[in-house]
């Protein structure tokens, strides 16, 4: 007779999605050794930048996707939801760069399998403020977004992955040639990946 699960057992996570994906390495389950870790990022970058055919195809794909119109929709038809919709629109229109600029950078993740961006916030004090942490078109004092800063895939050393759940908690980023590193948590980031196949945090490059 099959044992009946307790509620605690039913809610627990027992297995993992892939053989090595929880170790946080880029493309840890990749069959070809030369396409594992940061070597994979270097190879895809070389293909994108040095192969004219690949570069042209990627450019065409990215241009098509950039032409898609984006709209902010309220959660429901209530007045409160409509007010928050307008607030979100104001936040996206009050960054150091345009939303189109971010989309253009974000589409680069297709080549590498994933894209990581750090969200830097600010207080919306007013247009006369010199500090980028306070400068804004608005004077409502609410929290806004200063910038959505790209963190290039070739600077990412590894993902911080929860051993039990496979949840991505953040990334370790290399800093220059001095051997330093930054830790960027997911809750301060925008994180894109092409696929969640096998729980791989680095996704899968469309060039693979």
Segments predicted by a language model, with ranges:
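Structured, contiguous alpha/beta core segments that scaffold functional sites
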Residues: 17-21, 30-34, 46-49, 75, ...
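Extended, helix-rich architectural segments
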Residues: 1-98
